[in-house]
Amino acid sequence: MTTRPVFPSGLYGVTPDWDDLDQLSQAIEAAARGGMKVLQWRHKTCPAPRMIGMAREVKRACHANGVLLMINDHWRVAEAVGADGVHVGRDDDSPNAVRLALGPDALIGVSCYGDINHAKEMLAQGVDYIAFGTMFASATKPHAIPTDHQILTQARALVAQTGSNAKVVAIGGITAQNAEPLVAAGADSLAVVGGLFLASDIEASARALTHAFG
């Protein structure tokens, strides 16, 4: 019997909408050297015909550097390229439907925004992480209202109460300068876009973010 994978704690990189695969591969390598454990490939403007080809190259770069790959929204792309899992939002297919399609070993994470009741529903569907945010003002989602950090503490208690192995993920406007309070509040993982990949030194930024975990 195989053991179901566990979503790792630590730095969780989320890509900007980059089309340049060389740039992306180099960034993944640098972030991995700095301690990134998982990457979410998120490209909201990628044309459908290019998506599988790009995702396959991102997977190659991730696995070459010991990084797990999550695909944002598109579980069929995750299935096609053999990604490690998928991140789904409120308007995407349910975790139960995704699990049925991808099988028991796929990692599935969900956006819970600032809604602890939604998190409870998602944990009942066996997700591998529940993500909350935006934690701070974010250029990625400029109109999102920041979420009280106390939601992370509530989420950690909820996970313990349900006996789940799910991780608590914080996302939104996170940088090395504001990361530690989120970990102290209960975040197992920090999902970072601009604070990692738009930094002048990606490896150094990854190391600084990883340092927040002690």
Specify the residue positions occupied by each region the protein language model found:
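Conserved N-terminal beta1-alpha1 strand-loop-helix module at the mouth
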Residues: M1-P95, L100-D128, A144, Q150, ...
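A short, flexible beta-alpha/helix-coil linker loop
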Residues: M135-S138
